[in-house]
Amino acid sequence: LGATAYWMIGNAFTKPPALLSPRGIVAREPVVDIDTALGGIEYSDAYIVDNDARFVFGFVRSALNSGAAVANYVELLDATRGPDGWVAQLRDTDAGRDFQLTAKVVINCAGPFVDGLNDKLGITTKHSIVMSKGIHLLVPRIAGQERVLAFYDDTERLFYVIPMGPRSCIGTTDDRVDTAYTEVTDGDRDFLLDQINARLQLDEPLTPDDIISSRCGVRPLVVEGGGEGTENEDWTSLSRKHAMEVDKSKKFITIFGGKLTDCVNVGNEVARAVGRLGLKLERDRKSWYGEPPKATKTEFFRQARLMHLDKLRQRASFETLSTRLWRRYGLRAFAMLEAIRDDPTMANDIIAGAEYVRVELYYAAQTEMITTLDDFLRRRSKIALVLSYEEIREAEGIHEACRLLFGDEAQKRYDEYFTPEREASVTKLREPDAKFPGHPQAQGGGLPAAG
């Protein structure tokens, strides 16, 4: 009933939910262990094929194309309100240069740092945030289909197996923390591996040695007041929705919490609030983001088919190159077709197994605001999620990427990323313990680092 109601709330846009018997489950996904299963539900929904950072940058790039001014690696040092509006003291953290900016309205959407920023600027609100830590582990591909598998863990919280190209992304956890700066612990890792091994019929159980990379972060959850009294609440019952407060006298807007899937609605709400504070906005034509019109898509795939784009690939892939370029870049993919026509090697992978071709790298260097190698590997692409630390470090293509992205600073940016500290942290993620006695290093074998 819950799945059907949720489907109806979405205007029945996708296929209707289906109730599955244990046999129906294993017919669709043989890897699922049905020994203790009473049944399951097949539900159609959207998921992010690349990663959340790439999804968000799609909005940033579209906003830039529509005339927005955007900057990254800028820190707000302080801001004061004067008779003519706000005066912000800012710092370019990469160049170490301070500068000043004026603004009629300030919007605090700093996620887990929202309360600290409000305190710093003297803003009083009815809401605040508490933080929930979540992690994901990337392992070799588990299920063959492009399906997200969802299970209840031993604490009755949902966790997922999400396809990510040649890998599977397992997670997430949901634990209260008091700081936004978190990392994957042995306990986090062991919990997820235990849960997934108990619910899948794998040839060999997953161990720390199978971990290719990890993700870790916090969710800012909105609460009333200062969050007092929530310590003993069911953590998963706290709302994932957002709250917005507007200080009309100071022309200051604060956004608490929220989910990525609701980002357009939150943006529209903020735009209306900005308008009520006296700023005149351009009329929303609802065409600056999202997929271009169907006729444009049809023309792109026609051109890709005529130039035999997908046959240029020398390696097997989990999606065709034409599909991937259109999904990631939309209108901007037409220029990539032209570049590949001129030089077919532009359709080659920059790093084997990364599913990221040379023409994307050239485009990223020109248009994707890449300042550090971490930007490129984790935020504009998913290379650092689907390939191990060692694979990336030893790949010839990483040096080509650094030269193209950073020019004279190529070696500097390479050295910033490949540090002993980073190698130690990713090696620790794969270290054995008593829970996994069959792990190679537990028996004295060698263990390569992964990231």
Write out the residue ranges for each language-model feature.
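C-terminal accessory subdomains/tails of enzymes that are appended
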Residues: 1-3, 8, 13-36, 41, ...
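Residues that recognize and position ribonucleotide moieties
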Residues: 18, 69, 99, 130, ...
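Helical element adjacent to the flavin cofactor pocket in flavoenzyme catalytic cores
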Residues: 42-105, 264
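Beta-strand segments within the central parallel beta-sheet cores of soluble alpha/beta enzyme folds
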Residues: 73-78, 131, 210-212, 285-287
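Core alpha/beta catalytic barrel or barrel-like domain that forms the active/cofactor pocket
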Residues: 74, 167-168
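A structural signal for short hydrophobic beta-strand segments in well-ordered beta-sheet cores
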Residues: 76-79, 160-161, 244
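Flavin-dependent oxidoreductases
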Residues: 81-85, 90-162
